[in-house]
């Protein structure tokens, strides 16, 4: 878990949620620097959450953001399991339906932005609804 200095000078521990939120902001800025446009963050639908929704041209990009301090145990990208992929697909399906779309009518993909230590890895089209 990360620490941040406080006004008193002694560091305080960030919660897991605060750490995740900070890395999601980093990922959003990094992707915007690559030309993607921000649509939404922390989208909750029944059964799941999508960290970021971005647009690249006409493509809707659902982004899972992961952070690990080290590559021990496979690093950040390896932590996106089949179960997590299924939840993301279901959440995206519900979000698209709320916006009058579906996987058949909207060009979309699922990316992973993985921060491992000081390294960033952008895995475009990491998985899809046919995986």
From Swiss-Prot:
It comes from the Bacteria. This is UPF0102 protein YraN. Residues 1-19 have a biased composition (Polar residues). One of its GO terms (molecular function) is nucleic acid binding. Transmembrane segments: none annotated. Residues 1-20 are annotated as: Disordered. It comes from Shigella boydii serotype 18 (strain CDC 3083-94 / BS512). InterPro entries: Restrct_endonuc-II-like (IPR011335), tRNA_endonuc-like_dom_sf (IPR011856), UPF0102_YraN-like (IPR003509). Gene3D superfamilies: 3.40.1350.10. Belongs to the UPF0102 family. Pfam families: UPF0102.
């Amino acid at each position: 878990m990360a620490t941040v200095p406080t006004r008193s000078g002694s560091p305080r521990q960030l919660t897991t949620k605060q750490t995740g939120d900070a890395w999601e902001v980093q990922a959003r800025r990094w992707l915007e620097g690559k030309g993607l446009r921000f649509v939404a963050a922390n989208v909750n639908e029944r059964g799941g959450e999508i960290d970021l929704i971005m647009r690249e041209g006409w493509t809707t990009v659902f982004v899972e953001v992961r952070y690990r301090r080290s590559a021990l145990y496979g690093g950040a990208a390896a932590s996106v399991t089949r179960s997590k992929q299924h939840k993301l697909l279901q959440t995206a399906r519900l979000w698209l339906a709320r916006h009058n779309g579906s996987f058949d009518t909207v060009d979309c993909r699922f990316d992973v932005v993985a921060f491992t230590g000081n390294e960033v890895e952008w895995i475009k089209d990491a998985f899809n609804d046919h995986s």
